[in-house]
Structures are given as C-alpha cells and as structure tokens.
C-alpha cells in the first residue's frame, strides 16, 4: 500500500507526530485496538481557512495559465483519477494538467501542476510560503519520483509558486542524498512500526496536534526537553555525558562539558534546579539582574497593549482585528478597537496610533508595555500596508516609548518553567485566569467561528480574553517592579 506524500512530509518534520497520526488512523480503521487512540490538541490542527487560502492560491496560477497565457489546461481536481486516466490525458498532449492523482509502488499523491513540453515534464507546486523550505523540496522529490515512474518521461525542472506570486526554480543536486536517506528511514520506520513503542519526541520537531502528547512523555521521563529554550543538539551533548534527565542535570558534579560553553551549562543546571523545585501552582525563580534590565516602576499614564491577529485572510501579514489598551490610571480602564474588514482595520490602526500620540501629550513620560515583539512588528506592517503614520511610529520606537516586558523577564530572571509565555510568567505574580478562552490559538479558532460561521456571541469572549491580557501585563509589571 503506497504512502501519501503528506504522510512522508509529516515524518520529515517529526517521526513522533507521524507515529501518532499513523496510530490514530489505524485505530479509526479498526486495524488496532482502540486503547491506542491518542488525544490531539485541536487548536494545532491545520485551519480550514488556511486550506481554503491554499486552494485559492492554486486557482490563481491555474487562471494565469488558462487565461493570461492561453494554455490548454486539463483540470483533474474534481475527477476520479488514476494512473490510467492521467496517462490518457497526458497522451492528448495538453499544455498543463492540474491536480492529477497518481501513484507509484511507494507513494501516492495529488500534484498541483504538471507542465508538458514535448518529451519532458515540469512540476509546479503552489505554496503560500514566502520562501523555499527543505520540506517543499522533499515533497517535490516524491512528486518527481511518482511522475517519472508513471509517465516514463523525465522531469527536467521543478518550480514553486510562492506567496509572492512568483515562480522559484528548485535546485535538487545538493538534496539528493538527503532525500534518499530520508526515504530509507521512512520505509524502515513503517516496516518496524509498533503501536507499543513510539519514537521519542525530540525538541524542535514540528509536533503539530500531538504536542501535548509529547509533553506528557517529557514530563513522565523528567526529560531534558522540559528546560526552557534548550535545543536538540544541546540535549545530545548532555546525554553524551550521561545526563539524561532534569534530575540528573540538577545533581551532576560536572562544572562543564565538551561542546557547551561553561556559562550555558551552568545556566541549564540552575534551570534544572528551579524546574525541579516548581509545582503546577508555584513556579520557582531566581533574579539574575537586580536592576531588571533598567525596568521603570509603573507610572501614571502608562499603557498596556495587546493585539489579536488572524493569519489566514491576507498573504504576508496578519489581519489585526483587535487592538486592546489597558490604562493604569485611578479608574483602571480598557479601550479596544475591533475590525470586521480591512477598511475597519485601517480605521482601527489609525485610531490606535492617534490614541497613543494624544496620550503622550497628556503624559509625556508614559510608556507602552507589551509582551514579545509581535505588537511592534504588527504596527510596522500595518503602517506600511496602509501608508499612514510610518514616520510617527518609528519616532515612538526610537524614543523607546514601547517596552517589551518579555525582554525584561528573559534577561533578568531564571524561571523554573518550560515556557516564558505571558500565561506562564503571570503565575509568578499570582495571577489566575478565569476566562473561558485561555490561549492565543484558541482565540484564532474563536475568531474563525465568529467571522466565517457567524457565531457572533464569541466576539465578547475574545474581547474579554484580550482585556485580561492587557490587564495582566499591568499586574505583571507591578509585580516585577516590587522586585527592585
């Protein structure tokens, strides 16, 4: 039974995720016992809207061939397809065949475009990505293998039609050995598959909807993967020195190891100690910079900002549907700007920037606090996209009006947690969330249901979630200042 190309790419990104997906598929097909069923993190499933966007991107290229270039395009996307049907169409010598579904002994897949030029073929794959990724090249290798096997013709060139609406030629030479090795690993993996023995999930793999399952394994095994921002290569270096768990790292008498800087090793030892001492409700921490990277105490007029963006409406930037602002004046207040279309988004952006500029006239020393770099990146993209307030925004940034509390936390504290996300770090300040909505990924799902499925009651829940993020930024700032 041939494997799908998408399965092969999932394996490339994460053998663990592939094993989980294969196991669940076998359970659903009643080929193995239901006890092997693995829970998924639904918030990490591929968005239906992203799939729709990808299909629209394919149609853009199809129409370019069909209308702009006046080529004869055979559309097999909605037809029962087989190798036989594909070959029948190929023998009619059209210019392009769109989405044929074909198979070889090892693989089966639906190619986006096959371009026919005399006795040679070209493959074009449409991707919304802004750049060529190795997984795209691996996918094209499989497509080429299938197509050459079925057609008995040579595929001489492959291209990617990316989000910039340009063709990008793919060079295969330096990837031949990588693909051959990957295919061998994939086949061997399937030949030795056992529902009782999953591969160990490695740090840095694209675990997708099985990330929670991986975390369960890391917690069960007290795995080094639990350490904040540790990389797979660093884990291997520790294991090469017989340090396989957080507990063993905490207790080791070693002061350094080969291939890892002494300061880095000491940092991970300290993180292991803090992680070991932490509980679900109480996270241990240590101050490593008494000045907290120059953190200012909360000042009258300071604002706390957080945005909610949706990534699948436009290419190259998020649709910013919610700008939130919390003010720490005597009458703690929350202001927000909601958008349902791009015109409203522009108006919201303009209103937001004007709010900041007017606020500075009242409070010249005010700072605008946020968490991570998303807000600054978003504002710059919006200013550029809408062609307004670009100069004023850059002046605010240059004057250091914006303060990233993540930078303060990351540079000043060591925390006994696997993540330094706001949802984690705010626990240090004793903040307990009560909102129904608990994560950024959930907010994206809620917005999809609101926007596309007309579940309008979800709007209030999203706004409450954003309000909590903004207010909790203030509470976190206040707690951090208490450490000074």
Listing of model-derived features with the role each one plays in the protein:
Residues 77-81, 251-255, 264-271, 436-448:
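Short linear loop/turn motifs
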Residues 211-327, 333-334:
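C-terminal extensions
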Residues 1-117:
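Metal-dependent nuclease catalytic cores that hydrolyze phosphodiester bonds in DNA/RNA
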Residues 14, 113, 143, 231, ...:
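A residue-level signal for conserved active-site and pocket-lining positions in enzyme catalytic cores
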Residues 252, 305, 326-328, 369-372, ...:
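Generic beta-strand/beta-sheet core signal
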Residues 158-164, 170-223, 232, 241, ...:
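Acidic, Mg2+-coordinating catalytic module of metal-dependent nucleases/exonucleases
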Residues 78-80, 89, 93-104, 108-190, ...:
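Conserved DEDDh/DEDDy metal-dependent 3′-5′ exonuclease domain
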Residues 58, 62, 144, 380, ...:
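Short, amphipathic alpha-helical segments that act as regulatory/interfacial helices
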